[in-house]
Structures are given as C-alpha cells and as structure tokens.
Amino acid sequence: MASILTSISASISRGTRLRVSKIKRLRSPLALALMGLMLSFGSYRVLALEVGDVAPDFKLQGTDGKTHHLQEYLSEGAVVLAWFPKAYTSGCTIECKSLAENGHLLKPFNMHYFMASVDPLAKNKGFAKQQKADFPLLSDPEKSVAKAYGVLSPRGYAVRHTFYINAQGRIVKIDRNVRPSTSAEDMAKNLEALSIPKKETNS
C-alpha cells in the first residue's frame, strides 16, 4: 500500500489524474481515507496565493458591527488580513492578545489590520470582547473568502496565515509562519520592511 500511496502523492504533485486502476486497487478504508486526505491537500496547494497576486476582494461582517469591504480600504492605504483557526483556542488567544496589547506598534502605519476566521460572528464577538481587541475580527462562516485566499484547511478551519496587501490591491507578503506571541511585533517589522508609509501627524 505504501508504494501505491507514494505513486498517488507523486501524481498529485504533478497535477495529473489518478489512474482508475490504481484507485480500484485501494481496498482498505485506511487507504481510501489517506487518498482523500492527499487529494484535499493537493487542492489546498493548488489554490494557494503567492506574492504578486491580486488579493481576492471581500465583504465580511466585523465584531465592531460594521461590514468591511477590502476595496474601500485600499483607497486609504494597505491592508493586513491575519487568518486564525478558531476563537478561544490557545494559539489564537495568544495572537489576539498580542495585537490587542501592542496596537501602538501598528497604528502609526497607514493601513488597516484585521484578524479573520470562519467562526460565526457571535463567537468572534465574544472572543474579541474577552481579549479587549481594539480592532475588528472578521467572520467568514460560509468559508468562501477563506477558500479564495487558499487558507481553508481540509478540517474546515482557516490556517494561520497573514496577508499583507498594498494600496494597489496586490499581495506583497504572506507570512505562513506566524508566531502568535509576537504577532504585533512581527507585523510591525514586516510593515517597516515593506516600506508601508506612516500616517501623517500634525506637528
């Protein structure tokens, strides 16, 4: 069975179809389950966005009671969209806390930042209130935006990826190795490295 699964994995990576004869040879439930998982991950990789791509537009409800439309924010500057798996879980709580407690590192930049998940809005509202988040958490319960960004995992939740979108609507950075405990500090460093301008201040 191992040799068959290796062949399947190679076929997926090459973007080719599985041969019917090989599928018929997979008799056990375990083999079929593994095949389904490989196919899911194969689709996930195909949909992944890359730097330079146009960021998929979105209109999502936020924990602040507003509908947030990407295109409207681009006229004002950059946008950072930080996807997280599930409200109230350990890593997501740490990430949200970092952003909530260190907003002073981010607010000087001419940009808007959000966390986003496929959780229901009511759940994210409670989570945002608990963490005293002073920025909107967006909800994508239909998972359509998560799919468009290529972050929907085979298990149905968003993976922890952060997208940096410039004012022209292009993705200029994707952080696929987010460290929850230093989310704010890392985001500020990335914004600086990307030359995202600071807001004008009255002297």
Predicted regions: what they are:
Residues 88, 93-131, 142-147:
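Structural microenvironment flanking redox-active thiols in thiol-disulfide oxidoreductases
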Residues 44-48:
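Sec/Tat signal peptide C-region and signal peptidase I cleavage site
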Residues 73-93:
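Short active-site neighborhood of thiol/selenol oxidoreductases, capturing the structured segment around
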Residues 59-78:
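A short beta-strand-turn-helix
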Residues 159-203:
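Thiol-/selenol-based redox modules, centered on thioredoxin-like
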Residues 1-25:
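N-terminal secretory signal peptides that target proteins for export/translocation
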